Amino acid sequence: MSNQKALVIFSGGQDSTTCLIQAIQTYGRENVQAITFRYGQRHAVELERAEWIAQDLGVSQTVLDLSLMRQITHNALMDETAAIETADNGVPNTFVDGRNALFLLYAAIFAKGQGIRHIIAGVCETDFSGYPDCRGVFVKSMNVTLNLAMDYDFQIHTPLMYLTKAQTWALADEMGVLDYIREQTHTCYKGIVGGCRECPSCILRERGLAECLESKKAV
């Protein structure tokens, strides 16, 4: 796919970094761009990690300001004083209403202006934390909507959609970057460098890594 370009929605976390590295290997570094969103997330370390990784991998990164979301929605991912909890309906209060819809919309607007058709997102429904906008049906719906809205042939790729977290770690291992993902990416909801090992995101990450490493030992 050396003649095609790709845009990766990039947060600096495990999943999006795995997708970014896979895109570089698939499309070629010169054909890959990253887009990152500042939406009022509670910790600056996420943005700092994303910037560092993009520079380290030699990928052009664009950061868009969507902090207006603070004016219209409230959740624990954007309020550092809020405790992280799961509601009665099973959806954690870290869920940001409309976030992935906005990310895909703005990514598509940017991509079309750059002549890019391939948009890559690291969302996953297998181990997803109860977020409705991480489901395959949502992404497929957005793909159709964006194509109709802009009269453009976008192809939204979600390479991790049906992988468990252990399988995502295994993919990183296959690409030769497991240690890089482990040491350089940031996933913690509490903004603790290296992870707090207590929040849902850290627990999912560590459990998946343990399963992956155990599987390697068994081979």
From Swiss-Prot:
<feature type="binding site">
    <location>
        <begin position="10"/>
        <end position="20"/>
    </location>
    <ligand>
        <name>ATP</name>
    </ligand>
</feature>
<comment type="pathway">
    <text>Purine metabolism; 7-cyano-7-deazaguanine biosynthesis.</text>
</comment>
<keyword id="KW-0547">Nucleotide-binding</keyword>
<dbReference type="Pfam" id="PF06508">
    <property type="entry name" value="QueC"/>
</dbReference>
<feature type="binding site">
    <location>
        <position position="202"/>
    </location>
    <ligand>
        <name>Zn(2+)</name>
    </ligand>
</feature>
<feature type="binding site">
    <location>
        <position position="196"/>
    </location>
    <ligand>
        <name>Zn(2+)</name>
    </ligand>
</feature>
<dbReference type="GO" id="GO:0008616">
    <property type="term" value="P:queuosine biosynthetic process"/>
</dbReference>
<protein>
    <recommendedName>
        <fullName>7-cyano-7-deazaguanine synthase</fullName>
        <ecNumber>6.3.4.20</ecNumber>
    </recommendedName>
</protein>
<comment type="function">
    <text>Catalyzes the ATP-dependent conversion of 7-carboxy-7-deazaguanine (CDG) to 7-cyano-7-deazaguanine (preQ(0)).</text>
</comment>
<dbReference type="GO" id="GO:0005524">
    <property type="term" value="F:ATP binding"/>
</dbReference>
<feature type="binding site">
    <location>
        <position position="188"/>
    </location>
    <ligand>
        <name>Zn(2+)</name>
    </ligand>
</feature>
<dbReference type="InterPro" id="IPR014729">
    <property type="entry name" value="Rossmann-like_a/b/a_fold"/>
</dbReference>
<keyword id="KW-0671">Queuosine biosynthesis</keyword>
<dbReference type="GO" id="GO:0008270">
    <property type="term" value="F:zinc ion binding"/>
</dbReference>
<keyword id="KW-0067">ATP-binding</keyword>
<dbReference type="GO" id="GO:0016879">
    <property type="term" value="F:ligase activity, forming carbon-nitrogen bonds"/>
</dbReference>
<dbReference type="InterPro" id="IPR018317">
    <property type="entry name" value="QueC"/>
</dbReference>
<keyword id="KW-0436">Ligase</keyword>
<feature type="binding site">
    <location>
        <position position="199"/>
    </location>
    <ligand>
        <name>Zn(2+)</name>
    </ligand>
</feature>
<keyword id="KW-0862">Zinc</keyword>
<comment type="similarity">
    <text>Belongs to the QueC family.</text>
</comment>
<keyword id="KW-0479">Metal-binding</keyword>
